[in-house]
Amino acid sequence: LGTLAENILEEASGKSLTAGEIVYANVDTAMSHENAALVIRWFKEIGRERVWNNERIVIIFDHRVPAESIKTAEGQKKIRNFVKEQGIKYFYDINTGICHQVLAEKGFSRPGIVLVGTDSHTTTAGAFGAFATGIGATEMAGVWATGKIWFKVPETIKINVEGELNKGIYAKDVILNIIGHLGADGANYMAVEFDGEAIKKMSIASRMVLSNLSMEMGAKVAFVYPDEKTRKWLEEREAKPYKFVLPDKNARYVDEYNFNASEMQPVVACPHSVDNVKSIEEVEGVEIQQAFIGSCTNGRLEDLREAARILKGRKVRKSTRLIIGPASWEVYRDAMREGLLDIFIEAGGVIINPGCGPCLGAHQGILASGETAISTTNRNFQGRMGSPESFVYLASPATVAASAIEGKIADPRKYLR
């Protein structure tokens, strides 16, 4: 009667399991970004000469690319040297994209595997049916050395989303509605399984939004069941071997929640927490100085298409800066071929190279004190995108695009008629 989390961990450990047990699992893929520099330090302290498997470690530069400080440059150099010395096969330098997007594009995110990453939003790969979760640098050093990791088998909650998404409502609105309902710790150390008509109809890109943001309600892992769409994506990506793992018919869930997508409105997460969710009507008219469309949450092609639909033939308000950051160079080039980048430039937007910069307040558009931003990213904690005296609202790409035009938070639906 296993849940999806239990079934995958059983496969990875060779034991039969139930929630609450401690298990040692074999890791399929271990991903790090620039914080690999820290992992290297701990790995050397363990005293191992070689990593357990140089074809199962993936390193992707994305947080501060190209390097914005001497400290970052030194860290990146240290990692490049380690990659060379260990013969790590899958190393993606500053010209690839954001780690969670790259894992998907290169066929690493796939059903039935255990995937760990030194980034909290590693849960994104759950959209493909992977047991994917974030771990710390010391923990990752242990994985690099042994290829194994211990977990407490999480309990599972099931979230059913039925109905149809109306015009102007996107996966981002769905998950923010859910987080607003469950709260920031509503799924603490739990596995989440998403099901229902609305989820089945979603594209892979939209499903990634759900799994990505589930971290913001405390989820350990967040699954969308793999299906034909998943299979098609993986075939196109020449993915590594995988098998579809699903929950058993009568799996035990600690809780089940039901939502109706047809009743959902565009929503915005207000400062300074992701569960401070309000309907667009409640926050319409709040002045903004910056609008950001991009990140591992909403920087994919479908997101940029929606933003371009709204921005086409219109101008960003003079008092507002619009920054666009595609999630990867693959997305960037697709957007370029489709003429989307032209639309953004024509509207007065600034396009940055793929990376995490603005989302974590590292570079490429940091907020000053007293400034307000609306962003498609996944966190709005105090000081997240710059000054501790700045304010961040989170919304869908359509809502952010509409707000950039007006210089204040705006309902995207009036631009989609």
Regions found by a protein language model. Name each.
Residues 1-417:
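Fe-S-dependent hydro-lyases/dehydratases of central metabolism
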